[in-house]
Regions:
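Tubulin/FtsZ superfamily GTPase core signature
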Residues: 2-367
Length: 367
């Protein structure tokens, strides 16, 4: 189903009905520009239970995206030919299409905005999409990548302009430096694979949060739990860990809290949200061990909330995503100046020392 009144109209294409269910939080993911559209396609391939929206100035790029809703912005500014890497044109295109952008983020409880910073459309439009989502009353979370260093100073400076514009427009801002991906890439990783990794880390950031609300699990969270950590949180950090074998829980948790994606430690964070994804073979002791490690790495007074998501394809494995928030309005650069990464090898905590981790009563009673 397509809607178009004239050649000058903004194009909104509905490709399929949203698969949202009654009684669930209304979650939307908006991919801005080429990188955001690529991330949306990766999320769709992983069957995330959210509504997907693609925003672009480039009509051809939109046609390749598999999003539920596609919004072509800035027809007068770009004539459907893209922003040419100029973030101010991307911003002007989004400004021209405020009405359309406001319409697609209405009736949302949570809106994720994702893009690869440094280009024209994604960098320029993201802050305006965020502004529209906040005005609609949604919990607004930005998940973005910063360009690789080899992409040059201009692209990196452009990214900083986009990130600066986003501060104050989102509840939580997660920025992952692509250069950090080099620390987990092998010497044989191709350039194409590196950019795919950058797209996929955007997917992991969104999925790590949204799955806690939308996916069935041993320990489920609701929207209010996520909102308690993410609302007005400012800049946030994300770490991802994976483990297999006998020490999988410990390995995954340690990787997550000392992840190469983290530009600093999670010391000083006032809120921690973490997702444990595993098959049905996960044990109570493994959940407790993972929680202990995250708790030991966090601020003593941090509000820590977690959920356990079941994924039957992960038998024998555990993946942990940690989101740390509440750094008192500090930027990541300021946080790096105040804290150094610390060793995670801590004494094991007993259950009584986990009192400030939000463990559901039914599970606490079983421990």
């Amino acid at each position: 189903m397509a809607k178009a009144n004239s050649k000058e109209d903004h194009l909104i294409v509905m490709t399929k009905e949203s698969e949202l269910h009654e009684g669930r939080a209304r979650i939307k993911v908006v991919g801005c520009g080429g990188g955001g559209g690529n991330a949306v396609n990766r999320m769709i391939s992983k069957a995330l239970k959210v509504q997907f929206i693609a925003v672009n100035t480039d009509k051809q790029a939109l046609e390749r995206c598999q999003a539920d809703v596609k919004v072509q912005i800035g027809n007068k500014v770009t004539r459907g030919l893209g922003a040419g890497g100029d973030w101010t044109r991307g911003r002007d295109a989004a400004d021209e299409s405020r009405t359309e952008l406001g319409a697609v983020v209405q009736d949302s409880d949570m809106v994720f905005i994702t893009a690869g910073m440094g280009g024209g459309t994604g960098t320029g439009s993201a802050s305006i999409v965020a502004e529209m989502a906040k005005e609609a009353g949604a919990l607004t979370i930005g998940v973005f990548t910063r360009p690789f260093g080899f992409e040059g100073r201009i692209r990196n400076d452009t990214a900083e302009e986009g990130i600066k514009a986003l501060r104050g427009q989102v509840d939580a801002l997660i920025v992952i430096p692509n250069d950090r991906l080099a620390q987990v890439a092998s010497s044989k990783t191709t350039l194409e694979e590196a950019f795919r990794m950058a797209d996929d880390v955007l997917r992991q950031g969104v999925q790590g949060i949204s799955d806690l609300v939308t996916q069935p699990g041993v320990i489920n969270l609701d929207f209010a739990d996520v909102k308690a950590i993410m609302e007005n949180a400012g800049e946030a950090l994300m770490g991802i860990g994976h483990g297999a074998g006998d020490s999988r829980a410990e390995d995954a948790a340690k990787q997550a809290v000392s992840s190469p994606l983290l530009e600093t430690s999670i010391d000083g964070a006032k809120g921690i949200l973490f997702n444990i994804t595993a098959g049905k073979d996960i044990t109570l002791q493994e959940v407790q061990k993972a929680a202990e490690i995250v708790r030991a790495a966090a601020d003593p007074g941090a509000n820590i909330i977690f959920g356990v998501v079941r994924d039957d394809t992960m038998a024998g494995e555990i993946k942990i995503t940690v989101i740390a928030t509440g750094f008192g309005g500090k930027t990541q650069q300021e946080a790096r100046q105040e804290t150094a990464r610390r060793t995670i090898d801590r004494p094991e905590l007993g259950l009584e020392e986990l009192g400030d981790i939000n463990i559901p009563a039914f599970l606490r009673n079983r421990m």
